[in-house]
Amino acid sequence: MSKQDGKLTGLFGAPVSDRENSMTAGQRGPLLMQDVYYLEQISHFDREVIPERRMHAKGSGAFGTFTVTNDITQYTNAKIFSEVGKQTEMFARFSTVSGERGAADLERDIRGFALKFYTEDGNWDLVGNNTPVFFFRDPKLFISLNRAVKRDPRTNMRSAQNNWDFWTGLPEALHQVTILMSDRGMPKGFRNMHGFGSHTYSMYNDKGERVWVKYHFRTQQGIENYTDEEAAKIVGMDRDSSQRDLYNAIENGDYPKWKMYIQVMTEEQAKNHPDNPFDLTKVWYKKDYPLIEVGEFELNRNPENYFLDVEQAAFTPTNIVPGLDYSPDKMLQGRLFSYGDAQRYRLGVNHWQIPVNQPKGVGVENLCPFSRDGQMRFLDNNQGGGPHYYPNNQGIYESQPEHKKPPFPTDGDGYEYNYRQDDDNYFEQPGKLFRLQSEDAKERIFTNTANAMDGVSKDVKVRHIRHCYKADPEYGKGVAKALGIDINQIDLETNQDETYENFK
């Protein structure tokens, strides 16, 4: 019997005689335990919801193609970039960050921008956002961010107080907060926003020469954003507006595109950089490190099944290929373990076998992993009956020394270094970003901030005003006015670290 016949079967192939009526002892009697189809269905239903992502739970995705448009082989020998015109299959997932699976798409929030490239040397995952920076630069704070932006443990409601108490306790968060309160904190849809690798990564070439890089993805649909008022009206009619926009565009053949660029910094330049080049709260200025075009990706195929391809998509920055590498960015280093560990919890130890996660560029038949067994291991015959140890006399599991990476530069002793003693320049870049805004855009930052801080205690509001003022006096004055606070009553000369010391 073929699936096309539409005839109902159980999970193991037996035909189902009655889909609507349970087996009972008599016309009006109780259920019988031998109604195995009912038991099979209800027990499966009880388990069909898998754990949601701790962050980025609400998302949309699509398949597409990446095409190289410019030669960057002087920086990397990664095969994905080996020649102009080369194409690589890929998958992209966009998301909000704070909300749960059922949250509205139009919330003032960061958007996730995760890409999976199926290269011939394995999967390369670039797990980014629609902003080039983040709230902090040490992964030990990540759990607190998650809790602060999600539901309060007592009320089970989102808490602006918790959110802003955390953000304003970290002066380095102002750069990200400024972006979030700007027009770009509410993109019209996933098609109308830029993407960033955010972290500093590295590339190396055939000579073993390493450079530090940042990835940028510029939307070719143009940047479009909503005001808070516009977004509120749309949410009242459609909570899935961004997902619907992406899906419908692809279904209608209006395939969205993004151009990929990199910024490149040499190891010598990094040593002389005025700030820590691996600080996730700061950008590299484009006048010093201009954008270099790399390629373009186009999303041209919607998933056939959302759960199969989008909900079960697993991204981790440890999925990297020869020619590409990490950096000393502490936030990136912290994610190297966390992401894969979360996927093993959410999807199981063999989640690499799920179709969207398979290394399609290599081919499952060509894999030779040392890992075996675990729940639901089936795809590669569990490596068959060959040796499951190394070394062995069959030459299985031999290393590939030709893919050794060049030495990773490090210095110093292992210690819990206070990064604030190394760099307390929290406000220069937020100030420059503010001054780049038009007068109307500045007013919207003030208004958006006031909206977002509704219900927040005055001391937390004052903390934020003080930080804004240190970035630019007009920034602080504008936020104070929008919040209805007399800035002349605020001690603006308080040491910039005082709030953090109190926060600890």
Swiss-Prot record:
InterPro entries, sorted: Catalase, Catalase_3, Catalase_AS, Catalase_clade1/3, Catalase_core, Catalase_haem_BS, Catalase_immune_responsive, Catalase_sf
EC number(s) on file: 1.11.1.6
Any Gene Ontology CC annotation: cytoplasm
Catalytic activity: 2 H2O2 = O2 + 2 H2O
Record's keyword annotation contains Iron: yes
Keyword entries, A-Z: Heme, Hydrogen peroxide, Iron, Metal-binding, Oxidoreductase, Peroxidase
GO biological process: hydrogen peroxide catabolic process; response to hydrogen peroxide
Residue segments, region Disordered: 1-25
Any GO molecular function: heme binding
UniProt xrefs under Pfam families: Catalase, Catalase-rel
SMART domains: Catalase (SM01060)
The organism's place on the tree of life at top rank: Bacteria
Active-site residues, Swiss-Prot/TrEMBL: H56, N129
Annotated binding of heme, by residue: Y339
Subunit field text: Homodimer.
Biological role stated in the UniProt entry: Decomposes hydrogen peroxide into water and oxygen; serves to protect cells from the toxic effects of hydrogen peroxide.
Name of the protein in its database record: Catalase
Organism listed in the record: Staphylococcus epidermidis (strain ATCC 35984 / DSM 28319 / BCRC 17069 / CCUG 31568 / BM 3577 / RP62A)
Organism placement in taxonomy: Bacteria, Bacillati, Bacillota, Bacilli, Bacillales
